[in-house]
């Protein structure tokens, strides 16, 4: 399992970090900037391709949802922000959103639908 997550992170973290990358090695994705919006759209595509229902709320937060089989009204939410400060690092908030998505995707693949709904949020 650890090998799976290491490989998944090594493959997806550089991809996610490429949005808003700056020449000094950091990235800049200020809230509601074109870079932030592009990141949200691309992350939405990835979550949808993995079988999650995706949606944006009225302020732009992105959700990826896997409905529960027994208690769908009970929701477990995990994630983080994907905006950055100027020249931010790639292990800032985006890692929390990415880790939540990778964990839900792995659990879905291994065990199928959860009893309770699980949701990823990228803010």
For the regions a protein language model found, what residue spans apply to each?
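A non-catalytic alpha/beta surface segment that caps or lines the substrate-entry region
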Residues: 21-67
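Catalytic-core environment of secreted peptidases
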Residues: 49-50, 62-92, 100
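Alpha-helical metal-binding/catalytic segments enriched in His/Glu/Asp
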Residues: 78, 88-123
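General structural feature for long, well-ordered alpha-helical segments within catalytic domains
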Residues: 5-12, 35, 39, 43, ...
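N-terminal hydrophobic or amphipathic helices/low-complexity stretches enriched
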Residues: 1-25
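Catalytic cores of large soluble enzymes that bind and process phosphate-bearing ligands
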Residues: 1-8, 28-35, 39, 92-95
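Structural signal for hydrophobic packing residues in well-ordered secondary-structure cores
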Residues: 13, 17-20, 50-54, 104-111
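Fold-independent oxyanion-binding glycine-rich loops
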Residues: 58, 80-82, 123
């Amino acid at each position: 399992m650890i090998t799976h997550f290491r490989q998944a992170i090594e493959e997806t973290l550089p991809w996610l970090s490429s949005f808003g990358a700056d020449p000094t090695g950091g990235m800049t994705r200020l809230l509601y900037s074109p870079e932030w919006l592009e990141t949200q759209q691309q992350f939405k595509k990835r979550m949808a391709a993995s079988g999650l229902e995706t949606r944006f709320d009225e302020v732009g937060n992105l959700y990826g949802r896997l409905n529960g089989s027994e208690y769908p009204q009970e929701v477990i939410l995990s994630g983080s922000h994907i905006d950055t400060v100027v020249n931010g690092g790639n292990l800032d908030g985006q890692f929390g959103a990415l880790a939540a998505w990778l964990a839900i995707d792995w659990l879905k693949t291994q065990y199928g639908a959860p009893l309770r709904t699980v949701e990823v949020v990228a803010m």
